[in-house]
Curated annotation (Swiss-Prot):
Primary role: Catalyzes the phosphorolysis of diverse nucleosides, yielding D-ribose 1-phosphate and the respective free bases. Can use uridine, adenosine, guanosine, cytidine, thymidine, inosine and xanthosine as substrates. Also catalyzes the reverse reactions.
Family: Belongs to the nucleoside phosphorylase PpnP family.
Protein name as it appears in the record: Pyrimidine/purine nucleoside phosphorylase 1
HAMAP family referenced in this protein's UniProt entry, alphabetically: Nucleos_phosphorylase_PpnP
Gene3D superfamilies per the UniProt record, alphabetical: Jelly Rolls
Keyword RNA-binding assigned: no
PANTHER family registered for this protein in UniProt: PYRIMIDINE/PURINE NUCLEOSIDE PHOSPHORYLASE, PYRIMIDINE_PURINE NUCLEOSIDE PHOSPHORYLASE
């Protein structure tokens, strides 16, 4: 279940912005040292067929609104995800994401 809000966190006010502003996220830090990012991805179009994101640590990406297709490095085909679903990407890897609508997500940094 998606948490609608987080309490007792510190928010990094400086956003991470990529793809000319089409993707942005903010990092939140919990008192116990855990980190998560909350982000928004705008739809792909004729200028951006898909987005590619690299991972340094294992990540579980939870889709909180919208729908998208994801192809994790090493996989042959894209898989479909929608709000309420998540996927895991190992550390030192990456994934492609394509979408026709705005996607919001929580990235749980697990490594």
């Amino acid at each position: 279940m998606t948490a609608a809000q987080f309490t007792n966190v510190t928010v990094n006010a400086q956003a991470t912005i990529s793809y000319d502003g089409r993707c942005s996220s903010h990092t939140i830090m919990f008192e116990d040292g855990r980190h998560k990012t909350l982000g928004v991805i705008l739809p792909c179009d004729n200028l951006v067929e898909h987005y590619h994101f690299s991972t340094n640590t294992s990540e579980r990406i939870e889709i909180t609104s919208g729908e998208c297709e994801v192809k994790i490095n090493g996989e042959e085909e894209f898989s479909y995800y929608r709000a309420g679903q998540s996927f895991v990407v190992e550390g030192n890897s990456g994934f492609n994401l394509r979408t026709e609508q705005i996607v919001q997500y929580i990235c749980h940094l697990e490594g």
